[in-house]
Amino acid sequence: MKKETFHYDYVYAVHDFLNNDECSEFIRIAESIGFGEAPITTSQGQVMRKDVRNNSRVMKDDPELADQLWRRAMPWVVTPWRSSIAVGLNERFRFYRYEPGQRFAPHFDGAFERQDGEKSEFTFLIYLNDDFVGGETRFFKPGVFHVQPQTGSLLIFHHPQLHEGAVIESGTKYVLRSDVMYRRTEA
C-alpha cells in the first residue's frame, strides 16, 4: 500500500488497499443485492434529483466488514482530528454504480452521527474497478484537481470538500463508500 496526498490531510489516496479479487467480490455482492435509485439528502429529507445525481446505489449494513476494513485502514487514517480521535468505520456501506451518462454533480458529503455522539468527519471511498472512461473524482478547492480511479485504491477526504463524480463516458464504474467515525476527546 502506498499513500498519495492531493491536498494535505484533507484529500489523499491509499493505493492497493484492496486487491482485484476483493474488488470483484464486492461488485458481485452488490449486483446480487440489486441496485436502485439514489436520492440525495436535503433539508427537506431524501429527494430524487436526477439533475444532481443519476447513478444507482445499494446500501448494506455490515459491522463485521466495517471492523475488517477498519483494521486495514487504521494506519492511514488521520487521527487525532481537531479534538477527536478516529474510532472506526460507519457500518452502513453504500455501493454506487455509474453507467454511461451518469454522474454526481458537485456536492459536499454529509456527516453521519450516532446516538452516542460519534460523528463522521471523512469520506471513505474505495474504487472497485477502473475499466471505464470518465468518472474521475473532481475537487474544486484549492483550485481544481481530480483523482483518477484505480482498482483497489482507497480515497479518504474531509466531508466539507466540494467534489463531484464526473460523468461516465463508457463502461461502468463501481465504488464502495463508508465514513470514518470520530469520538470527541475530553478537554
Labelled PLM ranges:
Residues 1-154, 160-187:
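Fe(II)/2-oxoglutarate oxygenase catalytic core
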